[in-house]
A protein has these predicted regions:
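Outer-membrane beta-barrel architecture
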Residues: 71-75, 131-135, 173-179, 217-223, ...
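Residues that define the transmembrane beta-barrel architecture of outer-membrane proteins
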Residues: 66-70, 124-130, 166-172, 208-218, ...
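Detector for outer-membrane/organellar transmembrane beta-barrel domains
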Residues: 215-338
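Transmembrane beta-barrel strands of outer-membrane/channel proteins
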Residues: 61-65, 85-89, 146-150, 176, ...
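Repeated loop/turn-to-beta-strand initiation elements of outer-membrane beta-barrel proteins
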Residues: 58-59, 80-85, 140-146, 182-189, ...
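Flexible, solvent-exposed loop segments that connect beta-strands
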Residues: 93-124, 154-167, 197-211, 244-259, ...
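Outer-membrane beta-barrel "beta-signal"
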Residues: 358-369, 373, 388-401
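N-terminal, post-signal peptide beta-strand-biased segments of exported outer-membrane/organellar beta-barrel
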Residues: 22-98
Length: 401
């Protein structure tokens, strides 16, 4: 049973790092493209902040399925420097902010505005205090950008006498990126650091529980011109995570530790045609993770690995008319997973995963509206035609000025 649950956990981690599947809480255009990494979008600026210059002087509102799900982005500046103010976007406080768009695979990680680091669930869920972006041009063919996000949430009690007690979680997101914008080669690089810290003194300072979860990600994307209207896109990412929980009881500390490493690489063509943009790429992925529930004891650790070989992603955006765009995307991945523990037990699983998304966009001069539709809308129709779901999973509206 333990091996089965560990194997399931390894699969979830792998899916977060490598599947790149879109969900109902992802922003609408990218969600309709099933989270394509090679068809460029304004959401690129969240993990590659230097690209903010490309989308300057824009306001975007993202609307989820309820009034408390959504986010906002305001970008303003000149052709030399741009600034961004972000409201209620959850990848600022997500442990997957260090991975290339992997927050798209976290339910609620985008438009719910807050998500706990997995190791720190017991400390509550932090909410964003500040989330800022900045980008500046370096010469004619380069740009540099930064992102800073801080989040916190908690409760505390301070009696007239005695020690204060409470529980809290704090997260810090620091991102930096560099792009080369030449005609022969376009290159986007980013380095992201996400730090989560939690503490719980509700049982007294002598019985404090504390934890940390640190994520580091290095991501790259390259576009090489092949021929007229065709580029070769190359993507890659390395993501490292480590942390643990320490529980104190009467001065005795018990500490646990977790470690995970993920690597992904892929390549494929991008077609920029007169009335369509098409991107397809194959990718390979590898991840490994280990857990030690008590670092002072032997023979209680476990580990797992997962290999994605191969994976393929396809997406398209078609201008049906001057004002109506259809979008669709899909992804298939075949994975080899294994899990073992120090007692000599092991388990393996080979499986495939598939998913698709669709939606549309409306363009009226400087105003755009994007909709990611429920999958069943395409096959069973809307409610008034006998279908079983609503219309849009998410919607976005933007105005350029």
């Amino acid at each position: 049973m333990r091996i089965t649950s560990r194997l399931l956990s390894a699969g979830i981690v792998t899916a977060m790092l490598f599947a790149f599947t879109a969900n109902a809480n992802a922003q609408s255009r990218r969600s309709s493209l099933h989270g394509s990494l090679v068809l460029e979008d304004v959401t690129d600026a969240y993990f590659m902040p230097q690209l903010l210059l490309k989308y300057r002087n824009l306001m975007q509102i993202d609307m989820g399925t309820s009034a408390d799900q959504g986010s906002g982005l305001l970008i303003f500046g000149t052709d030399q420097m741009a600034f961004g103010i972000v409201a209620h976007r959850g990848d600022n406080v997500s442990p997957s902010g260090a991975a290339m768009l992997s927050a798209e695979g976290l339910p609620g990680a985008i438009l719910n505005g807050a998500v706990s680091f997995p190791l720190l669930n017991q400390f509550g869920t932090p909410s964003t205090i500040v989330d800022l972006l900045m980008s500046m041009k370096l010469g004619d063919e380069a740009a540099l950008g930064f992102r800073l996000g801080i989040a916190n949430a908690g409760t505390s009690t301070s009696p007239d006498s005695g020690d204060s007690t409470g529980v809290s979680q704090t997260s810090l997101n620091i991102g930096a990126g560099y792009s080369m914008l030449g005609e022969a080669l376009r290159m986007d690089l980013s380095l992201n650091l996400n730090i989560g810290l939690g503490s719980d003194t509700t049982n007294g300072v002598d019985n404090e529980t504390s934890g940390n979860d640190i994520r580091i990600g290095l991501n790259g994307r390259f576009y090489l011109p092949m021929e007229d209207q065709v580029e070769l896109a190359i993507i890659g990412g390395i993501n490292l995570g480590f942390g643990g929980i320490t529980q104190s009881a009467g001065g005795n500390d018990v500490s646990s530790s977790n470690f995970d490493l993920g690597i992904i690489a892929g390549a494929g063509p991008v077609y920029k045609l007169g009335k369509a943009r098409i991107g397809a790429y194959g990718f390979l992925g590898f991840s490994t993770s280990s857990q030690d529930p008590n670092t002072d004891q032997d023979n209680d650790d476990s580990s797992g690995t997962s290999i994605t070989i191969p994976g393929v992603h396809m997406a398209m955006e078609v201008d049906v008319t001057d004002w109506f765009k259809f979008r669709g995307g899909l992804e298939y991945a075949w994975m080899i997973q294994s899990q073992s523990d120090s007692a000599g037990n092991s388990q393996g699983q080979n499986s495939g995963s598939f998913g698709w998304s669709g939606g549309f966009g409306l363009v009226f001069d400087k105003f755009t509206a994007d909709f990611a539709l429920h999958n069943s809308f395409f096959t069973t129709g809307p409610n008034f035609l006998g279908g079983g779901t609503g219309f849009a999973a998410s919607a976005s509206a933007a105005y350029s000025f």
